[in-house]
Structures are given as structure tokens and as C-alpha cells.
From Swiss-Prot:
Keywords: Antibiotic, Antimicrobial, Disulfide bond, Immunity, Innate immunity, Membrane, Pyrrolidone carboxylic acid, Secreted, Signal, Target cell membrane, Target membrane
Entry keyword Membrane: yes
Alphabetized InterPro entries for the sequence: Macin, Macin_sf
Any Gene Ontology CC annotation: other organism cell membrane
Pfam families (alphabetical): Macin (PF14865)
Gene Ontology biological process terms in this record: defense response to bacterium; innate immune response
Function: Cationic antimicrobial peptide potently active against Gram-positive and Gram-negative bacteria including multi-resistant human pathogenic strains. Is not active against the Gram-positive Coccus species, Gram-negative non-fermentation species and against the fungus C.albicans. It leads to aggregation of bacteria as an initial step of its bactericidal mechanism. Aggregated cells are connected via electron-dense contacts and adopt a thorn apple-like morphology. Hydramycin contains a belt of positively charged residues that separate two hydrophobic areas.
Disulfide bond annotation, renumbered to this chain: 29-72, 36-65, 51-81, 55-83
Signal sequence extent: 1-24
Name recorded for this polypeptide: Hydramacin-1
Record family assignment: Belongs to the macin family.
Source organism of this protein record: Hydra vulgaris (Hydra)
Amino acid sequence: MRTVVFFILVSIFLVALKPTGTQAQIVDCWETWSRCTKWSQGGTGTLWKSCNDRCKELGRKRGQCEEKPSRCPLSKKAWTCICY
């Protein structure tokens, strides 16, 4: 039940984003926040894979969360999954 509520809240938040140019901004926010932010970690394993698992799925050796400039227009910096 907790996962369902979390998914609904994240979905509402993403729908509420009004892209100024393209739908890519919503995707950028999703990719930025979906694996590495503390408030979104509840979805890891259910809604999306962990950073390390996602990177391995992409054929990389490992992945880790690092603070980087954000691609999402709603924040300047964000914890983002980086694959190695």
C-alpha cells in the first residue's frame, strides 16, 4: 500500500510539471530524481532499479549516486546516478 501511495504522489508531481519547451524536461526530472534522492528512494526496487543495478543493466561495471548539476529545471544540483 505504501508503494502505491508513493507511486501516485510521484506521478501527480510529474504530471504537475508544465514543460516550457518539450516533454524532455519531464524525462530529465524523472531521470535526475528517480534513483538517488532521499525522498524518492522508496520507489527503488519497485518502481525502478537501484543506480548500481541500472548501470549493470546498461552494460557498465557499476553505478553510484553523485551530486552533479541538475538537468531538471526545478533544481540547480541533484544526486544523480553515474555509471562507470
